[in-house]
Each structure stands twice: as C-alpha cells, then as structure tokens.
C-alpha cells in the first residue's frame, strides 16, 4: 500500500534511468511512495541501476516487446490500496518540488488526472530554427487549466477513477508506433475524467543530438499524425479522414508561407498541420509509422 506508485518503463537506457532515479530521491523522502521500474529489455539492462539505487525500487522485466506492453506491466504493479499512479519517462529528470506540486494540484482541483510540463533541453549545437520555431518543445498552460493531451511522460492518475472504469489497459496495437498513452488518456477523457494542468510539476529531458534535425522532426510529426489518424478512423470513414488530411496539408502549407513572408521563419504550429495531414492519409491507407520497432520484431497492421 502507498499513497503514490511511480511507474517507469525503460528500454536500454541505464544511464538516463540512473539520472531519473537520483532526481526522485529528494522528492520521495518522507512520503509514502513505491517506485516500479518495468524493463522492456529481456536481458534486463536496467537491473544493475535499480539494484544500486538508494531508492527501494520494484524492478520487473517485461519480455514482450513494445512500450504498451511495458506500460501494462506497470499497471500490474498496482495494489488494491494504492491511491495514485504517476507516470514518468526513463529519459527525464524531475525538478525539485515536482511530487509535492502534483499532490497539491490534485487535492486543490479534485482531479482524476494531473499532468505537468516536460521541458526539452536542446543540445548546444542544435540548429537555431528548432528553438525559434517552437519545434520539439511542448506547450505549457496555467495551473488549473484543462490538460489537453496527457501522456505517460509526467502525469498523475487517481487510481479510484481507474478502478471505477474496471482498470483500462494500454492498447498494444500501438506498441511499435507509439500513441498508446494518447489513446489511453483520450478514453479516460471520453469517460468523463477531470483532467487538470499543473505548471509547477516540471520534468526535464535532454534531447539527443540525433533528434535535433529536420529529418527526425519531420518523421516524428508524421508519426504523431499517423497515430491520431488511426484513432480518428475509429469514429469516421476513411474518405472523410483522407479529405481532412488533405485540408490540413493545404492549410499548413499556406500558414507556413505566411510565416516565412512575415519574417517569422518556419513555425512548428503551422508545419504540424502538414505532417499531421500526411499522417492521417497514411493511416487511411493502412500504413503504420513504426518509430519503436526493433530490427528483429516485425510490425503487424
């Protein structure tokens, strides 16, 4: 039994996992907290880090490949008496006061879901257009505002609410493409969850140099569009999704031209219409963007 279970899915990033665990040490001091690490590497690359941690880490291996499978194994660690489940990613570090901020916001707003900002720290030699255009960095809101797109990178969930829904699971058809957390929290919203933003509950992530480039940002945008397109297809026909995708591309191109003409350069908000539209059309054709596929693991779909 604990007030909080912090669930961390990891895969072959022991150094980053160690940084995260160290950042959690002052946060959990004096609080009733369990920490569960689910290693999606069958050989257990995170085991030594967890055993060496000053924290009492519950470490398990989920050999089935895929981020959704690891997240579901994290759900399996929940006990009947746990009150809140908190998701953080293995490549993040929590800011001092993070846990207290989540706790205070949940109490103040009586929310079922509380999420906070993820601050992306670009490498020093990252191209200037990335930060100037708002790429990679996520939006922030005022504390108390609705949380529009919770994810497993910095989110608290009231477990009694999950129990009232008979404990929904992460959709493993999204394991290799990503997006299982988007689908999970969208289902909670559709079920009536009260989702609130807490701007003080900050985590940081260092952006690897190999991601600070146009090719990765473009592919990530299409992948995110592909995921949202697959979810949209559950409610709308393929022709409607294709037409909506084409409309988004057209709007995004026009908005990007406007941004450039006005001297703002390429802006992430405008470019996202283009990549999302491409992703929607790809989803309508049955194409998956398997960002998390592993060389020996085929992608179905």
What are these regions (language model features)?
Residues 23, 37-48, 92:
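A conserved acidic beta->alpha catalytic loop
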Residues 69-84:
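Active-site nucleotide-sugar/metal-binding loop of Leloir-type enzymes
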Residues 97-128:
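Conserved donor NDP-sugar-binding/catalytic core segment of glycosyltransferases
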Residues 116-117, 131-148, 163:
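Short, flexible, basic/aromatic active-site loop/helix in glycosyltransferases
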Residues 139-157, 175-177:
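A recurrent flexible, glycine/aromatic-enriched loop bordering the glycosyltransferase active site
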Residues 175-186:
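Acidic donor-binding loop at a coil-to-helix junction in glycosyltransferase catalytic cores
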Residues 219-226, 233, 237-301:
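Non-catalytic, C-terminal membrane-associated alpha-helical segments of glycosyltransferases
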């Amino acid at each position: 039994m604990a007030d909080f279970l912090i669930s961390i899915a990891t895969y072959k990033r022991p150094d980053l996992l160690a940084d995260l665990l160290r950042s959690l040490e002052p946060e959990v001091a004096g609080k009733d907290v369990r920490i569960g690490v689910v290693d999606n590497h069958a050989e257990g690359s995170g085991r030594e880090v967890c055993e060496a941690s000053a924290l009492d880490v519950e470490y398990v291996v989920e050999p089935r490949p895929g981020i959704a499978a690891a997240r579901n194994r994290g759900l399996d660690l929940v006990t009947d008496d746990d009150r809140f489940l908190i998701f953080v990613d293995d490549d993040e570090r929590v800011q001092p006061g993070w846990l207290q901020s989540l706790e205070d916001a949940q109490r103040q707003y009586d929310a079922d879901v509380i999420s906070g900002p993820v601050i992306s720290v670009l490498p020093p030699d990252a191209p200037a257009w990335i930060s100037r255009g708002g790429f990679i960095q996520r939006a922030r809101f005022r504390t108390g505002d609705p949380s529009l797109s919770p994810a497993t990178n910095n989110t608290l969930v009231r477990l009694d609410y999950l129990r009232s829904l008979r404990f929904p699971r992460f959709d493993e058809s999204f394991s290799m493409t990503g997006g299982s957390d988007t689908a999970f929290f969208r289902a909670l919203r559709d079920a009536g969850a009260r989702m609130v933003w807490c701007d003080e509950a900050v985590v940081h992530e260092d952006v690897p140099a190999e991601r600070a480039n146009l090719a990765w940002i473009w592919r990530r945008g299409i992948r995110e569009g592909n995921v949202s397109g697959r979810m949209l297809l559950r409610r709308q026909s393929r022709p409607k999704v294709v037409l909506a995708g084409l409309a988004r591309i057209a709007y995004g191109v026009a908005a990007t031209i406007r941004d450039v003409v006005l001297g703002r350069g390429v802006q992430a908000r405008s470019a996202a219409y283009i990549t999302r539209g491409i992703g929607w059309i790809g989803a309508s054709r049955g194409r998956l963007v398997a960002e998390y596929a592993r060389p020996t693991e085929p992608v179905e779909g």
